[in-house]
A protein has these predicted regions:
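PAPS/PAP-binding and catalytic site of the sulfotransferase fold
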Residues: 87, 194-203
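SF2 helicase/translocase NTPase motor core
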Residues: 5-7, 12-14, 21, 25-181
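Conserved helicase ATPase motor motifs in RecA-like P-loop NTPase domains
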Residues: 78-79, 180-198
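Short, compositionally biased segments
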Residues: 4-7, 12, 188-193, 200
Length: 203
């Protein structure tokens, strides 16, 4: 909390996002708190390298926006093609940076994502730690096998699943993503059920 005077001049607490310290922060302490919330990389994307013909127009529009933003969320209902959009986002980053991209999926979905890649001509490999310069696919539970500095992009499939993880796992995922310059969250069930799940998304 930080102190602020209300209209009558009496002090009252004002919540600072994520702050738990008591009143009376020094300027340096508050600045350190703000700095701790800054993103590692500056935001901003790039002009898409490719928007393949197999995409529908609305998918191209969403991807053009997401790639130019660099950090985005695609909230699309079931059946609207989130998997090909994830693959194209990751493939664009690989082509732009010549560095690997990582797609995180629920346990039962990683093999399906690889098959979708084959269907659409995007090479994607299921991996448990061996990384290649291309689209790597793994499940959330294996994230600890990877180094975030190896990747230019990370894509979270069914990102609403993050709220179901216990605190340490959720924190590990958000800290991993925080280091990676290009990020995409995808889900069909976007509504956060609590302020903590909304905060996880914004990180």
């Amino acid at each position: 909390w930080v102190r602020r005077e209300d209209r009558e001049g009496s002090p009252r607490g004002v919540a600072v996002a994520g702050a738990t310290a008591g009143e009376g922060w020094s300027v340096n302490a508050y600045q350190n708190f703000v700095n701790s919330k800054l993103q590692v990389e500056s935001s901003g994307g790039f002009v898409p390298v490719t928007l393949p013909d197999f995409l529908f127009d609305f998918q191209k529009y969403l991807l053009d926006w997401a790639i130019r933003k660099g950090r985005a969320a695609i909230l699309a209902d079931c059946g609207l093609g989130k998997t090909p959009m994830q693959l194209v986002f990751a493939d664009n980053v690989v082509r732009h940076t010549n560095k690997p991209a990582l797609i995180l999926t629920p346990l039962a979905v990683s093999s399906q994502t690889v098959r979708e890649g084959e269907k659409f001509g995007i090479e994607a490999r299921k991996t448990s730690g061996d990384v290649f310069v291309g689209v790597n696919v793994t499940n959330y539970e294996k994230l600890h096998h990877f180094n975030p500095n190896d990747f230019a992009a990370v894509v979270c499939d069914e990102s609403s699943i993050l709220k179901s993880f216990e605190g340490t796992t959720r924190q590990a995922i958000t800290e991993f993503m925080r280091v990676v310059p290009y990020r995409l969250l995808c889900t069909a069930t976007a509504a956060p059920s609590s302020s903590s799940s909304a905060a996880t998304w914004t990180r």
